[in-house]
Amino acid sequence: MIEERIPTNNYESVQGSITPSGFFGNSVDMIVELENFMTEEEQEFLFNFASNNTTWDYTISKKNENGTVIYDANIWEDRVATLHTLQKINPKVIDVVQKMFDRLKVKVDEFYNVDAMATSPAIVRWPVGTRQEPHADKELHEGPDAGKPNAFPYYDIASIFYINDDYEGGELYFPLQGIEFKPKARAAYFFPGDMNFIH
């Protein structure tokens, strides 16, 4: 199997954060699960795509003005396909995910009393042995740069769709809220992206 990489600047954006850190508080009640959000047809289509795709984004790491890494490309190498890549290899994925975004927006807007704007779609695979340390989606959460923007300052509210759950491990862990759970296949999850919700 030959894998292809498409150069992508998925962290370049003119859009900054629209909510300050802490805007949503730190309550566990701000972490939302929507079971069976994805249809069986969406699940099957996206699972088949993610299982068979061999073309992934190619990005480079980025540091802030203090030399702190705000995006580590090594973590995501050969396992993320974002808008630019999806447009080239299978635009139908974009359509399917956009319909899911549209349905989720209604729930997010209602829950947080906001007018959320979706970022572009991304398909992420987690091969055996991969993991990610607790982090905030929109900002750095530790060290001298804690609270400063990372490469995605516009990730005010994070949302994740889980295509499958037939694997060991993979728990979603929120250390500050003291909760850990295994995400369910076809479920959607959303929560604030600031350092009060490292995961």
Question: What positions do the PLM features span?
Answer:
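Non-heme Fe(II)/2-oxoglutarate
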Residues: 2-111
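Catalytic core of non-heme Fe(II) oxygenases with the double-stranded beta-helix
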Residues: 94-199
